[in-house]
Amino acid sequence: MASSNLIKQLQERGLVAQVTDEEALAERLAQGPIALYCGFDPTADSLHLGHLVPLLCLKRFQLAGHKPVALVGGATGLIGDPSFKAAERKLNTTETVNEWVDKIRKQVSPFLDFDCGSNSAIAANNYDWFGGMNVLTFLRDIGKHFSVNQMINKEAVKQRLNRDDSGISFTEFSYNLLQGFDFSELYNRHQVELQIGGSDQWGNITSGIDLTRRMHQQQVFGLTVPLITKADGTKFGKTEGGAVWLAPEKTSPYKFYQFWINTADADVYRFLKFFTFMDLAEINALEEEDKNSGKAPRAQYVLAEEVTGMVHGAEGLAAAKRITQSLFSGALHEMTEADFAQLAQDGMPTIKLDGDADLQQALVNAELVPSRGQARTMIGSNAVTINGEKQSNAEYNFSDADRLFGRYTLLRRGKKHYCLVDWQ
């Protein structure tokens, strides 16, 4: 991605929501590499899909020769960003936030290159400059540059100020000053000239630009990526079970892979532009091929492979594909013990059974049928499989061979109703 037309290329991918002084920024990028940053507040113990677009945007800039700074908000995470939030956030303890800071720093690291010469990435934590700052310094040196009149007119907090039931605390109201100072301080420490973030961060980003100009007499820039929406109007990055997380212990590689496989045709080519590094020509060719093939589109599989491989590595992708193929074909012999544990983690119905339970009892306990009588009927009509093999003996008792890894048995009724038995 050549620097001189990087903004144009990002726009072609639909990755620019707003940008300050686009012409001046394009000119600055054409002059040579810059340092830029994106902030990630530790509001949970993992990043989720909503963080992926700005994180990949940092990577896109690094690939074009620029220096990315990944800022984890050890201080701002203790305060809470009120931007477009309907109610006050619950304050987390310092211990919890510190623990989350470490986890998020580790999560961000694989996406960037920290050892590639002059544009090696930097990891920063804003607690480093706020942790020792006293309140007088904060109010005199930072607060004097902010107009309350302007702050209360920012869209991000306006709705909270107009609500009688919630309002906004001074704690959250001051968040804007903290994030604004981050930009100024990162300019001071690392000559950072550009901040990127989600479109909900526009108000905080412009505050940082104003403060850096006042404190350092320097023009700096801001760029936001769009809030990702789906064609059907529903929220992106959520499943029935909640958010899709980047941490494998919160959303397994298999479930993550399935999330992308289930992308609607109306969204998939747009998502390839947002979430992969494939060339636009390649994406357009794939769309054309899918349109003319007369078969199911290939794009969802390409998207699932690209993003799962990027987030979970080759091993995570291999496990996700192995589980997908095994469940589809019914042949479970290639699945590992860890694969079965992933299914249990993902919310596949799982029951614990004692060793003497028979098939009828297992089906009832698994809520695949309401009664033993119904179980007999289902088994007799060849509608039940054990580990992918049809079982038509209504009086069947499980054998050791049915307990894969001495522990797991996968039951299926019909084509789609699964339950994992975890033998005790």
UniProtKB/Swiss-Prot annotation:
Enzyme Commission no: 6.1.1.1
Keyword set, alphabetical order: Aminoacyl-tRNA synthetase, ATP-binding, Cytoplasm, Ligase, Nucleotide-binding, Protein biosynthesis, RNA-binding
Give the residues the record marks as binding ATP.
238
Gene Ontology cellular-component terms listed: cytosol
Where mainly found?
A: cytoplasm
Q: Which residues bind L-tyrosine?
A: 37, 175, 179
Location in the cell reads: Cytoplasm
Which GO MF term does the entry hold, naming one?
A: RNA binding
Database matches in InterPro entries: aa-tRNA-synth_I_CS, aa-tRNA-synth_Ic, Rossmann-like_a/b/a_fold, S4_RNA-bd, S4_RNA-bd_sf, SYY-like_C, Tyr-tRNA-ligase, Tyr-tRNA-ligase_bac-type
Domain of life (superkingdom): Bacteria
* Domain S4 RNA-binding, residue spans: 357-414
UniProt xrefs under Pfam families: SYY_C-terminal (PF22421), tRNA-synt_1b (PF00579)
Q: Where is this motif: 'HIGH' region?
A: 42-51
Q: Does the keyword Repressor apply?
A: no
Query: What reaction does this catalyse?
Result: tRNA(Tyr) + L-tyrosine + ATP = L-tyrosyl-tRNA(Tyr) + AMP + diphosphate + H(+)
Chain ranges for the short sequence motif 'KMSKS' region as given in the UniProt record: 235-239
**GO annotation (BP), single:** tyrosyl-tRNA aminoacylation
Determine if RNA-binding is one of this entry's keywords.
Answer: yes
Assembly with partners or alone: Homodimer.
Free-text function comment from the UniProt entry? Catalyzes the attachment of tyrosine to tRNA(Tyr) in a two-step reaction: tyrosine is first activated by ATP to form Tyr-AMP and then transferred to the acceptor end of tRNA(Tyr).
Stated family: Belongs to the class-I aminoacyl-tRNA synthetase family. TyrS type 1 subfamily.
The entry's protein name is Tyrosine--tRNA ligase
Q: What organism is recorded for this protein? A: Serratia proteamaculans (strain 568)
Q: What is the lineage of its organism?
A: Bacteria, Pseudomonadati, Pseudomonadota, Gammaproteobacteria, Enterobacterales
